[in-house]
UniProtKB/Swiss-Prot annotation:
This protein's domain notes: Has the structural arrangement of an alpha-helix connected to a beta-sheet by disulfide bonds (CSalpha/beta).
GO cellular component: extracellular region
Presence of the UniProt keyword Secreted in the record: yes
Domain of life, source organism: Eukaryota
Subcellular location, record wording: Secreted
Record's protein name: Potassium channel toxin alpha-KTx 9.6
Organism phylogeny: Eukaryota, Metazoa, Ecdysozoa, Arthropoda, Chelicerata
Keyword terms of this UniProt record: Calcium channel impairing toxin, Disulfide bond, Ion channel impairing toxin, Neurotoxin, Ryanodine-sensitive calcium-release channel impairing toxin, Secreted, Toxin
GO BP: any one term: envenomation resulting in modulation of calcium channel activity in another organism
Family per record: Belongs to the short scorpion toxin superfamily. Potassium channel inhibitor family. Alpha-KTx 09 subfamily.
Tissues in which the protein is found: Expressed by the venom gland.
Gene Ontology terms for molecular function: calcium channel regulator activity; ion channel inhibitor activity; toxin activity
């Protein structure tokens, strides 16, 4: 998942989306 889609991808997962080296991470 790319950075631009990260917030939507992580939404509803109680996550704080971060982006490292172009990679989306949903950090709980």
């Amino acid at each position: 998942v790319g950075c631009e889609e990260c917030p939507a991808h992580c939404k509803g997962k109680n996550a704080k989306p971060t982006c490292d080296d172009g990679v989306c991470n949903c950090n709980v």
